[in-house]
């Protein structure tokens, strides 16, 4: 059994101003665990800041979790002997993401997020997956028995790559989108019965692909929530919450009225369990992303990359303030990473949604495709919870997504960008003629070529 007071957590992306701060926060609040957090990042300055912030926090008398944060300049050194590995990286910079998201707009293609599917998600994967190939090899060589926790998008393809490269890896992907839908169901209960229900008390069965997940069951203390949800949907044809002011549309980057979820429920009889911004990118483009008027009518927003750049400036300021001595303020992150780590160490059990290879938990999707369902965490064990069959109409969408993701994974790892173009031109949001699709694809690759290891080979093929 592992020494829970002498653990090693390796963090790939340890200079993060987001996910890393969440982990620093949650480890500080947990009294049972201690050890070293090994920070590795190509952004060495960011990693060194997190090193000092984490150690300053651990030194405080009011902090329960005592950890030593240490920067490593080489990934092999960071991973050596690790019990857990956390991965949260930005593949490239926001300049590359700006191309992913906004270059397609010249062709009338709108993407609220652009990191999981669609033209942006596909090109992002071509940059990201070779990095994950390297991570998988490094994990195999330095800590093959470690549990690996991924937060990076495109989530499904990142996890799939880890298993393709190192089949024995013990990896899973975490996403908090389902939590938001549990909170929505809690609101439905509040509005309907004046009940105050923690989202954790709503028991759900989850099926799908990350960012395109659905609930096929939802219960609270044995009460079936589907009839209640159906009535609520019927009573709120325009969604819920305040309509987004068109004059301040760009200042509400994550808002939605859940109208897309409600519409998908009418189509499929299942409760969509991700943010509307993510859901729409997996659907045929004319449904929700036809044009700006359609987008506004469904009550969600497009998250501009300029907003992300501005947000990063703010995050860097907060980090710098903490680095210079301003006390780190603990908060409720809503994340379950530390609970998962504790369960894997044998300190209790937990059931929650994760992204792992399909071993039959979704009966009618391909074996080994990475799917999102519930899983049972216990001592050094992660077992998927059987989720059953997906109804044919919804499964048709899932099967297309799986096929696209498998194609893109193969293309990224072999450097066959022509194969990636096949997935690109087949994507339901790329509603373009062949020549326009080719021109868009080539322009997007050109804009991010610095991070594409096989770009020169692709150019030779074109010529």
Mark where each language-model region is.
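Conserved NAD(P)H cofactor-binding loop of Rossmann-fold oxidoreductase domains
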Residues: 89-92
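Rossmann-fold NAD(P)-binding glycine/threonine-rich loop
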Residues: 95-165
């Amino acid at each position: 059994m592992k020494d829970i007071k002498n653990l090693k957590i390796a963090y790939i992306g340890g200079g993060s101003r987001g996910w890393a701060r969440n982990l620093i926060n949650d480890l500080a609040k947990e009294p049972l665990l201690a050890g070293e957090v090994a920070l590795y990042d190509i952004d060495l300055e960011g990693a060194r800041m997190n090193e000092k912030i984490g150690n300053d926090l651990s030194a405080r008398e009011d902090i329960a979790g005592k950890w030593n944060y240490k920067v490593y300049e080489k990934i092999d050194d960071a991973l050596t002997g690790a019990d857990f590995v956390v991965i949260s990286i930005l593949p490239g910079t926001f300049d590359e993401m700006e191309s992913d998201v906004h270059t397609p707009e010249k062709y009338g293609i709108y993407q609220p997020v652009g990191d999981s599917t669609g033209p942006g998600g596909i090109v992002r994967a071509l940059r990201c997956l070779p990095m994950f190939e390297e991570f998988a090899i490094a994990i195999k060589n330095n800590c093959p028995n470690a549990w690996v926790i991924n937060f990076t998008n495109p989530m499904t393809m990142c996890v799939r790559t880890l298993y393709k490269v190192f089949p024995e890896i013990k990896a899973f992907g975490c996403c908090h989108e389902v939590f938001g839908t549990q909170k929505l169901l809690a609101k439905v209960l509040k509005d309907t019965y004046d009940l105050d229900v923690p989202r954790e008390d709503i028991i759900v069965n989850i099926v799908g692909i990350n960012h395109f997940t659905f609930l096929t069951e939802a219960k609270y203390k044995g009460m079936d929530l589907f009839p209640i949800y159906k009535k609520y949907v019927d009573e709120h044809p325009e969604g819920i919450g305040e309509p987004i002011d068109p004059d301040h549309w760009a200042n509400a980057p994550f808002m939605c009225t859940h109208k897309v979820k409600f519409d998908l429920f009418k189509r499929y009889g299942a409760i969509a369990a991700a943010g509307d911004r993510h859901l729409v990118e997996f659907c045929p483009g004319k449904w929700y992303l036809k044009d700006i008027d359609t987008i506004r009518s469904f009550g969600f927003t497009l998250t501009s990359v300029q907003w992300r750049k501005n947000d990063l400036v703010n995050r860097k300021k907060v980090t710098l303030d903490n680095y210079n001595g301003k006390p780190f303020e603990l908060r409720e992150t809503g994340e379950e990473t530390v609970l998962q780590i504790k369960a894997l160490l044998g300190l209790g059990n937990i059931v929650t949604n994760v992204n792992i290879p399909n071993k039959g938990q979704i009966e009618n999707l391909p074996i080994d495709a990475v799917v999102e369902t519930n899983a049972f965490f216990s001592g050094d064990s992660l077992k998927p919870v059987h989720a059953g069959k997906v109804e044919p109409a919804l499964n048709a969408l899932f099967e297309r997504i799986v096929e696209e993701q498998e194609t893109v994974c193969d293309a990224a790892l072999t450097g066959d960008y022509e194969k990636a173009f096949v997935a690109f031109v087949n994507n339901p949001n790329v509603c373009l003629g062949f020549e326009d699709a080719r021109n868009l694809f080539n322009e997007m690759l050109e804009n991010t070529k610095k991070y594409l290891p096989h770009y020169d080979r692709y150019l030779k093929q074109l010529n």
